[in-house]
Amino acid sequence: IFKSGIKTNSGETPGLEGAEFTIKLNSAVERAYSQGYTYAEVWNGIDENGNQVKVDSKRVQSAQAIAPSYAVIVTDKDGNAYTKNNLPYGKYIVKETKTPTDYETAVDFTFSITEDESEIKEIAKKTKHIVVNNEQLETYIKLIKRDLKTNKLVTLNSTTFEIKATKDIYDRATKKILFKKGETISQKIGNTTYTSFTTNADNIVVPDNSFNSKNDDKATITTPLKLPVGSYEITEIKVPSGFLQLEEAVKFEIKNVKDYETDKDGDFVKEVIIKNEQPTGTINLDKTISIRENVDTSLIDTSDLSGIEFKLSAKENIIDMSDGSVIYEKGQEIKKYNLTKDGKLEITNLPIGTYEIEETKTLNGLVLNTTKYEVKFEQKDLTTKVYTEKLDISNDTTLVEFSKTDITGDK
């Protein structure tokens, strides 16, 4: 048996090392099936697709007694495998029982020995040559965009990705370089060559030479063609609105393709998830007490301002840029906060948007500050993670006027 590892339309058939073939008499295999033994039991725990599956060892042993293996042969570095002994007359079935990693397993095939060896005079005719081709396994890449913190799918706005080779990508049969290290992966469909891939979304912007399909789920894009085994990385050339750029490329490797999920057509699909972060806002509030002149402060304890309370509300709808959902509705109270003992307040992890903060409680002897302070966070670039707004708020002491009245009611 000569075993080759081919790539579709490459025209090359170099030998493939390490493929194992098991040879059984076809009539014996059919007899085992007729007695109720399954395919995997007959082939020692290997199913029709070449996968190892769980089987009852006793039934396997019984099936092997009915349909024993006449030979188990393994291809050498040149792709050749030979039976050690001559096979007697008959029709045989051959199964590839071990396949080199990331090659498709060949389908079962049969051959016949139709002449008795003793009647064959020419030595060359005593060897039956069989060529078996294995297709190199490749996979589609499904890129999935998610929010780093919430893990939500980013469906509101599209993302555009590039895929690059992080090492030279070879045709494993011919050893020819398909993509050089650092090269951007391009895929040609018809007359168009695509060099990037754009996710489906509610709002889609597709750059020139970028592939997009309305048939893909939102927040995803699947490459139109398969990629070969190798090492790759993903970068973003268009970041979705409301998100930060990736801090580093997302690396992935294509290997052990048979472990990947398959689509409805049985093609392998490798999922790669890319997560980005949304910027946030932080409010730093510093509270001071303004002491009026000629005011008795003996009843005012300014050593502990933790009794002062503030309320934070949304001044507009606060939107989650992952999917466009409303996090806080306009006018909605978000939370009430008390100051620290020394009059400070820090509110963190606020989604980008516009807020109002107002004082709702103060200390005895202080005037309640009724001003509503607007705090607005706007994303200005793709790298700033936290936008900080500082508020310095002051309270006046209460001014109380006392009057004295005599017993007659006169002042």
Where does each model-flagged region fall?
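Solvent-exposed loop/turn and edge beta-strand elements of beta-rich ligand-binding domains
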Residues: I1-K411
